[in-house]
Curated annotation (Swiss-Prot):
It comes from Oryza sativa subsp. japonica. It is a multi-pass membrane protein. Keywords: Membrane, Transmembrane, Transmembrane helix, Transport. One of its GO terms (molecular function) is oligopeptide transmembrane transporter activity. The gene is YSL1. Belongs to the YSL (TC 2.A.67.2) family. It comes from the Eukaryota. PANTHER family: METAL-NICOTIANAMINE TRANSPORTER YSL1-RELATED (PTHR31645:SF83), OLIGOPEPTIDE TRANSPORTER YGL114W-RELATED (PTHR31645). This is Probable metal-nicotianamine transporter YSL1.
Length: 708
């Protein structure tokens, strides 16, 4: 008998296409339906809002693939049932249409990240320039008009759809790359369209709606206690008032707790470690050196303490990025060489055997079924071809158009810089798509950061090198990142018998939707934040840590390290070395299968608190702890519902920002201020109380605001 584990792995494949044998896939034009596009508009806007809000607050954006698949299934399934009850005939809801909606939604939401609204575009404005310090002169500050943002996105994003399109058959059919995210989405969608999977989906939708309602109600309840500066649950000094001054407190944010439930525990606790090491030890030590190492007291100047904070964080980010780039490149080369050797051995073996032979154990039937599934998928995937000439012509035309027009949007960048970016992007996109297919890890942001250094340094500070570098980063990130996302979607299409043409069309629709929706969502966040503390301001609810990091990278690339305060270069070198050491230690431990390998801190996550402080790290660690407790109590329930409950927590609090903004616009103020005070402030508090003032020893004060 064959090994049971191995047999199970083989038997999983035939159960998929055998279950759908009586449901031939519809032609591609029946997969991209009007109702699919309509649902995509609604869900794309919702998930863009969630992704951008998370990026503006925490810096890390979790994957919403499962939630998008679930909600698209639920909405269209409910729609078809409603039409049936009303006696209106409607097209059957297929898994192919489900994949089309999911692809449109994620394509739209992904642009909130790759589009730069939480990173390189936001890093161009004056608010982030002041927060990061350095490079604040006129040529290195640029506030984009919404129309220019839309034009830039349309120019750059559509070229990414053509970049690696001719390689889809090579990557998926020939190399058989896994593309873990794409495969996972396919597994989810295939399961939804079976009776057992539909029951599970209904349970998950109910849990998500309850989570959304609970998160919204909690945010509404908290609003009543925010009647003043520093009031409410979001300023709860969990670790004491001294720690509160260093931003060590729990702010009861349901959305950040939800993000913590989705993000890996390693990321969350790495951020906590970075928070403790920076705010607890490094910053107090540097503050004690004021007057000796630096004299500028401004907290945002590169001549002051910010000349240590931002460059040290940037050094850790770059150390981690360069290590990952080298490590993944080595793995990709090894995997490619191994695959070529196996193909050669297979050809030689077939020649020696005369092309015949049979398998001498009882895995024959399973392998035949696996071959059937593979043949069926290959047949559908290869039947609807997109001509390679169309892809090449589309990329060349859009690259030429972008080369001519992007410098008109960003006058600081030259035509030849854009042309070089488009010339090298296909090669880097292939490398990124290949490695993403192996390890589900996109290096688009790494290539973008390298573009900042190269282009920024070539332009120079006097000519606006900061803006030029950030613009080049945008071109590289969007083209390379979206090209890898498209390959994940093609893998989903392959495993669900969805036509590649409909997949390309849904990507184009989602991309066009994202180019319009995301600028509008960003405008909404600017309106919600207000003119006093706009996005990117350290005091804003949307501090945008990655925008500060990208700005710091651009300033360092243009101005060099010679402008930094005393000993800053040595500290940056130490942070860079620490990042490389941690990555090396983690890789070695995982290779040796040591249990500690999964708990070596992640340098990228450790660096985030260097830019915005430790507050959100506390919330995300609470999310990890809640998930650990849930898994201990009910592992199966946590595996089924944790992601959707977390998505509901993120969505519910995010939805509350809209009515709260309307209340603020109508000048409706919260009635109560809940504030935490030290004993030294008691005398001031007593002046506002009449009864029992002599006996009051509070640590918390509740004050009612009366409206006349």
């Amino acid at each position: 008998m064959a090994d049971p584990a191995g047999a199970g792995g083989e038997q999983e494949a035939p159960s998929v296409e055998a279950a759908f044998a009586g449901q031939p896939p519809p032609p591609w034009w029946q997969q991209v339906t009007v109702r699919a596009v309509a649902v995509s508009v609604v869900l794309g806007t919702l998930f863009s809002f969630m992704a951008m809000r998370t990026g503006l607050t925490a810096g890390f954006v979790p994957s919403f693939n499962m939630s998008a698949s679930l909600l698209s299934f639920f909405i269209i399934k409910s729609w078809t049932r409603l039409m049936a009850r009303c006696g209106v005939a409607s097209q059957p809801f297929t898994r192919q249409e489900n994949v089309v909606v999911q692809t449109c939604v994620i394509s739209c939401a992904t642009l909130s990240i790759y589009g730069g609204f939480t990173s390189y575009l936001l890093a161009m404005n004056e608010t982030v320039a002041k927060a990061a310090g350095g490079g604040t002169d006129g040529r290195n500050v640029y506030t984009l008009h919404t129309g220019k943002i839309v034009a830039f996105l349309f120019l750059v994003t559509f070229s990414s759809l053509f970049c690696t399109l001719p390689l889809r058959n090579t990557m998926i059919v020939d190399y058989k790359l896994i593309y873990p995210s794409g495969s996972a989405v396919a597994g989810i969608v295939n399961s939804f369209h079976t009776p057992k999977g539909a029951t599970k989906a209904k349970l998950q939708v109910n849990a998500m709606f309850k989570s959304v309602a609970g998160s919204f109600a909690w945010a509404f309840f908290q609003w009543f206690y925010t009647g003043g500066d520093g009031c409410g649950f979001h300023a709860f000094p969990l670790f004491g008032l001294e720690a509160y001054k260093e931003k060590f407190y729990f702010d009861f944010s349901a959305s950040l707790v939800g993000v913590g439930m989705i993000c890996p525990h390693l990321i969350n606790f790495s951020m906590l470690l970075g928070s403790i090491s920076s705010s607890g030890f490094i910053w107090p030590a540097l503050q004690a050196k004021q007057g000796e190492w630096y004299t500028d007291p401004s907290p945002t100047s590169f001549k002051g303490i910010n000349g240590y904070k931002v460059p040290m964080g940037v050094s850790m980010v770059l150390g981690d990025c360069l290590f990952q780039l080298g490590a993944i490149t080595v793995k990709a080369v090894q995997h490619y060489r191994k695959g070529r050797q196996e193909q050669k051995l297979a050809v030689d073996g077939a020649a020696d055997d005369g092309g015949g032979g049979c398998v001498p154990d009882d895995d024959d039937e399973n392998k035949w079924h696996a071959t059937y599934d593979e043949r069926r998928r290959n047949q559908v995937f290869l039947s609807d071809g997109i001509p390679d000439q169309f892809a090449v012509a589309g990329y060349v035309a859009l690259a030429a158009l972008s080369t001519a027009l992007v410098p008109r949007i960003f006058p600081q960048i030259r035509y030849h810089h854009v042309a070089v970016c488009y010339a090298v992007a296909p090669l880097l996109a292939f490398c990124n798509s290949y490695t993403s297919g192996l390890m589900d890890w996109s290096l688009a942001t790494v290539y973008g950061k390298l573009a900042i250094f190269v282009v920024g340094a070539s332009v120079g500070a006097a000519s606006g090198g900061v803006i030029a570098g950030l613009a080049a980063c945008g071109v590289m990130m969007v083209v390379i990142g979206d090209a890898a996302e498209l390959m994940h979607d093609f893998k989903t299409a392959y495993l669900t018998l969805t036509s590649p043409v409909s997949m390309f069309a849904s990507q184009a629709i989602g991309t066009a939707l994202g180019c319009v929706v995301n600028p509008a969502v960003f405008l909404a966040f600017r309106w919600l934040a207000g003119a006093e503390h706009p996005p990117g301001d350290p005091r804003s609810a949307y501090a945008a840590p990655m925008a500060v990091a990208y700005r710091g990278i651009a300033v360092l690339g243009v101005e060099g390290v010679g402008t930094l305060p005393r000993h800053a270069i040595a500290l940056c070198a130490a942070c860079f070395a620490a990042a490389v050491f941690l990555d090396t230690a983690g890789a070695a431990a995982r290779a040796a299968r040591w249990r500690v390998g999964g708990w070596v801190p992640n340098p990228m996550a450790m660096a985030i608190p260097f830019f915005v402080g430790p507050t959100f790290a506390i919330d995300m660690c609470v999310g990890s702890l809640l998930l650990m407790a849930w898994r201990r109590a009910d592992r199966q329930g946590a595996a089924t519902l944790a992601v959707v409950v977390a998505s509901g927590l993120i969505c519910g609090e995010g939805l509350w920002t809209l009515p709260s903004a309307v209340l603020a616009m109508l000048k409706v103020q919260p009635p109560i201020c809940m504030k935490f005070l030290s004993r030294s402030q008691i005398q001031e508090v007593r002046q506002h109380f009449v009864l029992g003032a002599a006996d009051i020893q509070p640590a918390v004060t509740l004050t009612h605001h009366h409206h006349q």
